C-alpha cells in the first residue's frame, strides 16, 4: 500500500543496464528525486513523493544495484559517472528537458556532475546530508580499513568488505542506527534494513569500490563549475557525515545552507514536513525566477 501510486513508469536501458523509473504528478518544473547509495532504492523518498507531486511533476528511479533496476557486476558499473549518465537517460526517456535535482548523501556526487557537465538540463540542485569530502570526516570513520581483514567487529569496524560478507545484516543494523540517531526511529530503521536486504553484500561492495569522486581538489573544481541555484540541508547531529561537510559544500558551490537542529543523516525520513516545505519553497523560488 502506497500513499501515491505512479502515474507512469517504465525502464530505460543504457549500455545493457535497465533502470526503472516512475513519474508522479504534472506541471512544471520537474523534480527528480535521485538515487543515493545503492544500499537503498527510491522508496526512501516515500515521504516526499505524495507531497511534492501535488505541486510539481516528480520523477524517481531506482539506482543501479537496487530496487527494480539491474544489478551489474563490478565496481566499474557503479562510478559516479554511471549514475550521472543514468540520470540523463531517465530524463531523456521521460521527455524531461530540464529539472530540479534533489540528492541525498552520496547522490550529491552524481547530481553535481550532471549540474556541472549539463547546466542546460538543471534548473536547481538540492543536496540533503551531502556526503562530500570537502571537510574532514568523523574521526571514528577513518580508523579501520575497508579492504583488509580486521581483528575487531566493534563499531565502524563493521564498515568492512569482509564483515559485510560474513554478517551483512549486522552491518545494516549498525549503519542505519547511526543514520537514524533521532529518538523513536524504529519504523525508519526497519524500512531501511528491509530495503537494504534486497541488495547482496557483493553488489554493495562493488558500489563502495566504484565511488571515485572523493578527492578534495577534484570535487572542488567540479563545484566551481555549477551555475544553478543550490540548497544544502544538513543536520547538526549527522553521525555519518559531519555538518561541516554540508557547510563546506554550500561555500564551495555558492549555495544556501539550512541547518536542521537535532537531525541525523536521514532528515527527509525523520522530519519530512520540514524537509518537504524546504524543497517546495526552493522549487517554487526557481519557478518564479523563470517567469
Q: What do these predicted regions represent?
A:
Residues 254-291:
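Catalytic active-site module of serine/aspartate enzymes centered on a nucleophile-bearing elbow/loop
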Residues 17-72, 76:
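Conserved HGGG/HGGXW glycine-rich cap/lid loop of the alpha/beta-hydrolase fold
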Residues 46, 60-106, 277:
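Active-site loop/oxyanion-hole signature of alpha/beta-hydrolase fold enzymes
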Residues 239-245:
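Conserved alpha/beta-hydrolase "acid-adjacent" motif
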Residues 226, 232-234, 238:
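Short beta-strand/loop motif that positions the catalytic acidic residue
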Residues 1-35, 54-56, 96-97, 280, ...:
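Alpha/beta-hydrolase fold catalytic core
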Residues 112, 116, 123-162:
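Flexible "cap/lid" loop of the alpha/beta hydrolase fold
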Residues 158-217, 221-222:
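Conserved alpha/beta-hydrolase catalytic His-Asp/Glu region
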